[in-house]
Amino acid sequence: MIARCKGCSDLLPEDMLRFRYIESIFHDSCITWGYEEVRTPMLEYLSLFTSSGTLTPQMLKRVYSFLDWDGWSGERVVLRPDGTIPAARLYIDSLQEMDVARLCYTSSIFRFDETGKKSRENWQLGAELIGVTSPEANAELITLALETLARLGFEDVELRLSHAQLIKAVLAQLEPNADEQHKIFDQLLDGDIALMSRLETEKPELFRTLKLLMENKGTSASFLKNVMAMAGTAGGELEEPLNDFIAGVDVLDKLGVSYQIDLASGKGFEYYTGVIFHLFVNGEHVGGGGRYDKLIPLLGGPDKPAAGFALYLNRLIPMIDAEDMYDMVEEKILIKYQGDNLKNAYEIANLIRECGISAELFYPGVDTAAYGWAVTVKAEDCYEVTDLIEDKTLELKEQSEVIYLLNGEEDA
């Protein structure tokens, strides 16, 4: 038997029903907020992710790349490892005339995992707000993400906030090399004792500030204001990002949005420049995003600020109950026929479909338990309609009578 690739999954009919349900809720939410749907190709040039330094070397090791050969020469391309960077490229290519662009999309993301235990193909629902740099723009995206999850039936969504520039300002005082800063941040998150001991000895004020940020989870702007007050002389480099962070959470406070300030949640801050947020449902990480004001100019575009987020479809699919999708599950009608009545069966099936109802031809082996009604065409003027749930049967002479009945305008 030929097996599927490691780290890849088949989406079965029930999975796809959940997939489309989640996607439709997200799309509907985005449209009502003024976002327009776009789609980027699965293949992008590798240079899109390397020339601007938008992804760390560690991330680039996980991309699927190959040579797009045209006979004499070629350029290396990748299966997109990220959704935001292609969306930024799309804006630069085709939408620069828009001062403010609200874009949304569904895309698959490919990242290599050596073990094959983690998914190598992941589906994301993304939204990008380009051209606005205010804290209100961050709040719009966070609110849109929370609204989508609420409409999907998720309660008590946990919102964790961090700030990329605050992380970078702290790390810059420890290590000037940007690539090394990522390693140090990972060490801090892992509680590296030697590093923390060195920091406490060499930079005691910075150590106290960092310890406060790493060990405490604030739930209001007051927490950040206290951090700034306690930073002392070490707070010089931290003042600007802290003020920006405070401005962002102030807006969320006004909107009544609950959150947790968690500097450690900023892991993976490669191209982010401001507020970073992550969303959790029952401890499962289901989405995240943030501000990336330098990405579009880094890619050769105009100096446009931007922010965005993604919801992780692969993680949301198993969390959706069938009952939540009731409106998506249409009643299905089973069409049977006797003798030489195939043409009549097709006619009545087409009429049913024109009413927006699913009609399927019966074949041996079909499980009738999945259907609410069955229509058996016995003759051109004889239609047997059976309520499979109530086990009631009615004979009708006209196709119009059948449609009238199945539309629920008359009881069987």
Curated annotation (Swiss-Prot):
Q: Does the keyword Amino-acid biosynthesis apply?
A: yes
Molecular function GO labels: histidine-tRNA ligase activity
For this protein, the record's CDD domains field holds:
HisRS-like_core
InterPro entries documented for this protein: aa-tRNA-synth_II, aa-tRNA-synth_II/BPL/LPL, HisRS-like_core, HisRS/HisZ, HisZ
Where in or outside the cell is it found?
Cytoplasm
The UniProt entry, under Gene3D superfamilies, shows: Bira Bifunctional Protein, Domain 2
Keyword annotations from UniProtKB, A to Z: Amino-acid biosynthesis, Cytoplasm, Histidine biosynthesis
| Single Gene Ontology BP annotation | L-histidine biosynthetic process
The parts of the chain that form a coiled coil are none
Keyword Metal-binding part of the UniProt annotation? no
Miscellaneous note of the record: This function is generally fulfilled by the C-terminal part of HisG, which is missing in some bacteria such as this one.
The text of the family note is: Belongs to the class-II aminoacyl-tRNA synthetase family. HisZ subfamily.
What binding partners and quaternary form does the record give?
Answer: Heteromultimer composed of HisG and HisZ subunits.
Q: What does this protein do?
A: Required for the first step of histidine biosynthesis. May allow the feedback regulation of ATP phosphoribosyltransferase activity by histidine.
Name assigned to this protein: ATP phosphoribosyltransferase regulatory subunit
Tell me which species this is from: Dehalococcoides mccartyi (strain CBDB1)
Q: Which gene encodes it?
A: hisZ
